[in-house]
Amino acid sequence: MKPIQTVLVLGGDRRQQSLADALEAAGLAVRTFGLGEKSARAAADLEEAVARAQAVVLPLPCTKDETHIIGAAPQIPIDRLAALFLPEQLILGGMLTASVAARLQRGGCRVIDYYKCEEITVRNVVPTVQGILKQLFEQIDYTVFGSSACVCGYGRVGRATARTLNALGAQVTVCARSGAARASAETDGCASCDFQRLPEKAASFDYIINTVPAPVLGAQVLRILKPSCLILDVASAPYGTDFAAAERYGVRALQCASLPGKAAPKTAGEILAQGILHLWEEEGYV
């Protein structure tokens, strides 16, 4: 394999600009498209930019609608972009569905979902939690200290969120399916319950932060919440909240996507760049 020297960074949010900066700092020749940049590295023609790149880095997530690259201006249809890729190119994107990955590689190029890189997902927890706190602080008019919080799910993000809220003085209840996860939450200083018992406790919460990408906050829970309760759903699609039911019951429920790009785009972009460079090294592209 030839070492990668030329990279096109395409679409996305401010993380992609930071990612491009970090790849440039690593000595790569970087061009961008669809980021709204006015620098010398910003390409004016998509076809030319793709043709000159050994690797193309797509955003995280790559798409919301499975039709267009997210955040690109002007809009870039996925199928139009895929038609430009060459067999020898390496294409990287975040949170690729099987359908999107298949369409991207139809010309024979290699496609890698960099969000499956554990280094990236582990490091990405910190800017994600910062984004959750930013959203929470913007929505509440009381202190976190002394508040009653529920965190649904106790994976990486759920655990870091619960620990942080606990450190800020919140009374945190972790709702998780796994007995091991609940035990872990209790050793971290939180209360715990399973999802069957959530309706019994729901009326006491000031806010709920959901990290589970499966239906866990339905009408049975939503109708019990106090009117001032806030839900921040930070899970990936299909999310965990019945937003239509939340609206019916007058519950404030916010779908919070791409939090690292909103709260800490510089750090989040550097995390992506570092992980991608290590991924290339492991795959023999360096």
Tell where the protein language model's regions lie, with residue ranges.
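Glycine/serine-rich phosphate-binding loop and adjoining beta1-alpha1 elements at the start
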Residues: K2-P3, L58-F145, C256, G275
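N-terminal glycine-/charge-rich "phosphate-binding" loop or analogous flexible N-terminal tail
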Residues: Q5-E47
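Residues at the starts of beta-strands that form the adenosine-phosphate
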Residues: T6, A29, L90, S148, ...
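Glycine-rich adenosine-cofactor-binding loop
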Residues: L8-S18, L23, F145-L165
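Residues in the short beta-alpha loop(s) of Rossmann-like NAD(P)-binding domains
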Residues: D13, G36, T97, R177-S178, ...
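NAD(P)-binding Rossmann-fold cofactor-contacting core
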Residues: A26-A40, L168-D188
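Rossmann-like adenosine-cofactor binding region
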Residues: P61-D65, P74-I91, T187-G261
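Rossmann-fold NAD(P)-binding glycine/threonine-rich loop
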Residues: M95-Y114, V234-W280
